Amino acid sequence: MSTIEERVKKIVAEQLGVKEEEVTNSASFVEDLGADSLDTVELVMALEEEFETEIPDEKAEKITTVQEAIDYIVAHQQ
């Protein structure tokens, strides 16, 4: 089983169409990985599905980097 970090990075790479090597923990979805607002919505939906969790809009807006996504998932795993 992959770690949460590996799974988040794989989803980010797939959703944003970038190489997994480009997906560093400090990478910003918009500035570093070229995501637009639709990409970020789709990314949040993919994370919710993968980790069987719900990310409220007000929380999703604050998740702007790969590490913030990892931290949120870790904190909200059952």
Swiss-Prot record:
<keyword id="KW-0963">Cytoplasm</keyword>
<protein>
    <recommendedName>
        <fullName>Acyl carrier protein 1</fullName>
    </recommendedName>
</protein>
<dbReference type="InterPro" id="IPR020806">
    <property type="entry name" value="PKS_PP-bd"/>
</dbReference>
<dbReference type="GO" id="GO:0031177">
    <property type="term" value="F:phosphopantetheine binding"/>
</dbReference>
<keyword id="KW-0443">Lipid metabolism</keyword>
<dbReference type="Pfam" id="PF00550">
    <property type="entry name" value="PP-binding"/>
</dbReference>
<dbReference type="InterPro" id="IPR006162">
    <property type="entry name" value="Ppantetheine_attach_site"/>
</dbReference>
<comment type="function">
    <text>Carrier of the growing fatty acid chain in fatty acid biosynthesis.</text>
</comment>
<dbReference type="InterPro" id="IPR003231">
    <property type="entry name" value="ACP"/>
</dbReference>
<keyword id="KW-0444">Lipid biosynthesis</keyword>
<comment type="similarity">
    <text>Belongs to the acyl carrier protein (ACP) family.</text>
</comment>
<dbReference type="GO" id="GO:0005829">
    <property type="term" value="C:cytosol"/>
</dbReference>
<dbReference type="InterPro" id="IPR036736">
    <property type="entry name" value="ACP-like_sf"/>
</dbReference>
<keyword id="KW-0276">Fatty acid metabolism</keyword>
<dbReference type="GO" id="GO:0009245">
    <property type="term" value="P:lipid A biosynthetic process"/>
</dbReference>
<keyword id="KW-0597">Phosphoprotein</keyword>
<dbReference type="GO" id="GO:0000035">
    <property type="term" value="F:acyl binding"/>
</dbReference>
<comment type="pathway">
    <text>Lipid metabolism; fatty acid biosynthesis.</text>
</comment>
<dbReference type="InterPro" id="IPR009081">
    <property type="entry name" value="PP-bd_ACP"/>
</dbReference>
<dbReference type="GO" id="GO:0016020">
    <property type="term" value="C:membrane"/>
</dbReference>
<feature type="domain" description="Carrier">
    <location>
        <begin position="2"/>
        <end position="77"/>
    </location>
</feature>
<feature type="modified residue" description="O-(pantetheine 4'-phosphoryl)serine">
    <location>
        <position position="37"/>
    </location>
</feature>
<keyword id="KW-0596">Phosphopantetheine</keyword>
<keyword id="KW-0275">Fatty acid biosynthesis</keyword>
<dbReference type="GO" id="GO:0000036">
    <property type="term" value="F:acyl carrier activity"/>
</dbReference>
